[in-house]
Amino acid sequence: VAKTNYEADGSNADHIIWYGRRLAYMGRYDEAIAIFTQGIATHPKDARMYRHRGHRYLTTRCYSKAIADFEQAASLIKRKKDEMEPDGMPNAKNIPTSSLHSNIWYHLGLAYYLTKDYQKAAAAYKKCLAVSNNPDMYVATANWYYLTLRKLDKDKAADALLKTINREMELIENTDYLTILLIYKEQQNAAAVRTKFLDKDLTGTLSNATIGFGLGNYFLSIGKIAEGKDILQRVIAAPQWGSFAYMAAEMALEK
């Protein structure tokens, strides 16, 4: 349907976005980037084009290009009303959990985090948290914001952020981020989560990449270096190379 709509009217912004998103879901990232680039030429003031192209620049590890796109998107949404972003792959309740503004700040923060520009990552995540208006988006943002604050040795701010997290949060899809945050709070048994992580049937799932990076990072943070590195190596040995947790594991394992 996305391709048919695009072929019928390739200048329509929504058609461009959905066709580009579909191409990306099929792993055709370079083609998706080309579609969004065309969309930018046609709709240079549409922040959505930069947001989606930036996402695929992230996927393909073109981090500086991703940052440029997300910064442009951020400048285009100033003083504009936020809007919920429809999911390409809906969750179990078919309820979108992220908005245009939250996605722009979230992905910009991630791009800065992956390039080790933690000051700018923290600023982006702070803005993202302010527009994370449901528990799912909140825990996803809090996860990366917490890691960033720790990198900056802002331990008091990191601990204060953790205090806003609790087991009773009603989530639709981001339960893995909550699990990891509860491990950081020492309210979730890391060894039990590790046992589940090592279950071969789960290897390669997106969930396992998210849990794996969080778990590996936790073990590194408490001085269990061998265990931490082993888990991170397992994350990047699995096929979820397009996930943000995989990218972060790559970065953590860099010499």
List each language-model region with its residue ranges.
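Canonical positions in the second alpha-helix
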Residues: 5, 38-39, 72-73, 94, ...
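Short coil turns that delineate tetratricopeptide repeat
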Residues: 10, 44, 78, 99, ...
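Residue-level recognition of tetratricopeptide repeat
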Residues: 21, 55, 110, 147-150, ...
